[in-house]
């Protein structure tokens, strides 16, 4: 196929119905008038994305061509597809958009000028273009003159594939083509596919520049100390990094350079199931005019939102620009991280609520990426399921996990960054018997870790997972810190702990070319 960018420039972008970087007001107006959008009492635009309310990982492909073939860690998550399949779908896309009204966002991903990437997002829905405008970094005056995107996203929810003809998995497709520098999305109205596709592109490109891309949130204290929060969807990244005593750098995607960390994005995409003003005031207050709410339940007569209602999905989302968060770091940058927090939502209830990690343990747990998949974040998940997602973001990491872990280990060692594993999941028993760890306790533990208050306390070793558990922590009951003591039945605890330990050991077998120092972190099954 000819250069896709040239085809887009000479074809799609030459029609009369193209809107470039429309103001928020206009996009909202179109979404309400033509796309079923409803304005809530708080001013946010409410959109229902239909049957696809989460990512469709089975439908994501990477075009397998020479420039990427030897670099990508091909697996069931990183599935290859031929250039021919892509070309055929792109031709369908060109026919699909003929004479359509289209919305184009031109801006950037990456707040560090040395590493930012100019992107173009082309949408057939105004609300998705509003999403792109609020999620990515808007251009400043003059930055769109002679704009030359390095990557283009073409998102066409109404273009559905025919698997038998098109070689896809279903009617939905998300295809990354690095040779043509384009992401082609069809069949799904879930806006998160746009965001995560560009994240995946950055995760592929940056390690070649000695930058560690990270699925994490980041914040900074008044004294300049930076903290990173890693974790899969629903583990508490957004919630825990929204701290009134610290400034938010970003809530989901960052890069770590020799100079510090930078946010990839200009917005936030927060889960809002069971959202309350009391528990999460920063997120609550950010949901206002200009924000988008996906798949929440709204009373169309009163405009009242019921954040507790999950009739469409548990994966309800709010998208808003980072400046809607009070005291956010609008330049999106911070210094070298002082503290790293790995978040896991352990549904077995056996991991400690907080444990301090060595460099080798940090690399091990980073590569393992253990959590329990929570309902609604992907299609088909209705109860928590144990899962291992490398680098706490497996679906978005295209290179070998060892590549990212090596970069992390080097940076931890070079800058003496402290690392903690924090369990935001269950305590006192597994899911269904125990209870979710209280948010106020988790906040206190995280605060103590960041302030260095856990550097001087005594630690005990967990006999199975070999984790260092603090014996005390400010504002946290002592009995909460040691998980075995929160269970009524010690034998049941031992059984569950050994089951999870076996899962860790089994999962880590897939990493063959790692040092013994890291392999030896494996739990000791008893």
Curated annotation (Swiss-Prot):
Pathway(s) it belongs to: Carbohydrate biosynthesis; gluconeogenesis
Enzyme class: lyase
Cofactors, names only: Mn(2+)
Database matches in InterPro entries: PEP_carboxykinase_ATP, PEP_carboxykinase_C, PEP_carboxykinase_N, PEPCK_ATP_CS
GO biological process: gluconeogenesis
UniProt cross-references to PROSITE patterns, sorted A to Z: PEPCK_ATP
Record flagged with keyword Endoplasmic reticulum: no
Enzyme Commission number(s) from the entry: 4.1.1.49
Classification via Pfam families: PEPCK_ATP
Membrane-spanning ranges: none
Residues where ATP binds: 196, 215, 231-239, 280, 317, 442
Reaction catalysed by this enzyme: oxaloacetate + ATP = phosphoenolpyruvate + ADP + CO2
Cofactor binding note from Swiss-Prot or TrEMBL: Binds 1 Mn(2+) ion per subunit.
Keywords, comma-separated and alphabetical: ATP-binding, Cytoplasm, Decarboxylase, Gluconeogenesis, Lyase, Manganese, Metal-binding, Nucleotide-binding
Chief place of localization: cytoplasm
GO terms under cellular component: cytosol
Positions with a binding annotation for Mn(2+): 196, 215, 252
Amino acids binding substrate: 55, 190, 196, 317
HAMAP family associated with the record: PEPCK_ATP
Classification via PANTHER family: PHOSPHOENOLPYRUVATE CARBOXYKINASE (ATP), PHOSPHOENOLPYRUVATE CARBOXYKINASE ATP
Function: Involved in the gluconeogenesis. Catalyzes the conversion of oxaloacetate (OAA) to phosphoenolpyruvate (PEP) through direct phosphoryl transfer between the nucleoside triphosphate and OAA.
Protein name: Phosphoenolpyruvate carboxykinase (ATP)
């Amino acid at each position: 196929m000819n250069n896709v960018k040239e085809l887009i420039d000479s074809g799609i972008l030459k029609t009369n119905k193209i809107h470039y970087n429309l103001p928020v007001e206009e996009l909202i107006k179109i979404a309400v008038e033509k796309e079923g959008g409803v304005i809530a009492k708080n001013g946010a635009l409410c959109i229902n994305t239909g049957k696809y309310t989460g990512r469709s990982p089975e439908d994501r492909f990477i075009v397998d061509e020479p420039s990427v073939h030897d670099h990508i860690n091909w697996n069931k998550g990183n599935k290859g597809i031929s250039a021919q399949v892509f070309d055929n779908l792109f031709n369908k896309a060109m026919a699909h958009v003929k004479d359509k009204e289209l919305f184009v966002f031109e801006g950037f991903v990456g707040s560090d000028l040395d590493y930012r990437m100019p992107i173009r997002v082309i949408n057939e829905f105004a609300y998705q273009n509003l999403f792109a405008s609020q999620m990515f970094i808007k251009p400043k005056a003059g930055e769109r003159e002679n704009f030359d995107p390095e990557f283009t996203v073409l998102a066409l929810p109404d273009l559905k594939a025919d698997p038998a003809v098109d070689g896809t998995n279903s009617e939905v497709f998300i295809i990354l083509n690095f040779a043509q520098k384009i992401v082609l999305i069809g069949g799904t109205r879930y806006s998160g596919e746009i965001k995560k596709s560009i994240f995946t592109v950055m995760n592929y490109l940056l390690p070649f520049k000695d930058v560690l891309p990270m699925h994490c949130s980041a914040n900074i204290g008044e004294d300049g100390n930076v903290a990173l929060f890693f974790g899969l969807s629903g583990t508490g990244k957004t919630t825990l990094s929204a701290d009134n005593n610290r400034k938010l750098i970003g809530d989901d995607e960052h890069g770590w350079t020799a100079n510090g960390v930078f946010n990839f994005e200009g917005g936030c995409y927060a889960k809002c199931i069971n959202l309350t003003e009391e528990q999460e005031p920063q997120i609550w207050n950010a949901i206002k005019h200009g924000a988008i709410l996906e798949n929440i339940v709204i009373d169309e007569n009163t405009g009242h939102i019921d954040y507790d209602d999950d009739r469409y999905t548990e994966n309800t989302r709010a998208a808003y620009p980072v400046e809607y968060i009070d005291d956010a770091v609008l330049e999106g940058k911070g210094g070298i991280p002082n503290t790293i927090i790995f978040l896991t939502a352990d549904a077995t209830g056996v991991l400690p609520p907080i444990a301090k990690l060595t460099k080798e343990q940090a690399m091990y747990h980073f590569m393992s990426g253990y959590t329990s998949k929570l309902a609604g974040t992907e299609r088909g998940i209705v109860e928590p399921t144990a899962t291992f997602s490398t680098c706490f973001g497996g679906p978005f990491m295209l290179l070998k996990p060892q590549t990212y872990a090596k970069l992390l280990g080097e940076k931890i060692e070079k800058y003496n960054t402290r690392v903690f594993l924090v369990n935001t999941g269950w305590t006192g028993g597994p899911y269904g018997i125990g209870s979710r760890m209280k948010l106020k306790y988790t906040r206190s533990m995280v605060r103590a870790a960041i302030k260095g208050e856990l550097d001087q306390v005594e630690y005990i070793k967990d006999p199975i997972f070999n984790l260092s558990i603090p014996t005390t922590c400010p504002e946290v009951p002592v009995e909460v810190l040691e998980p075995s003591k929160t269970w009524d039945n010690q034998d049941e605890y031992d059984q569950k702990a050994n089951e999870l330990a076996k899962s860790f050991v089994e999962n880590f077998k897939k990493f063959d070319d790692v040092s013994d120092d890291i392999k030896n972190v494996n739990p000791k099954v008893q």
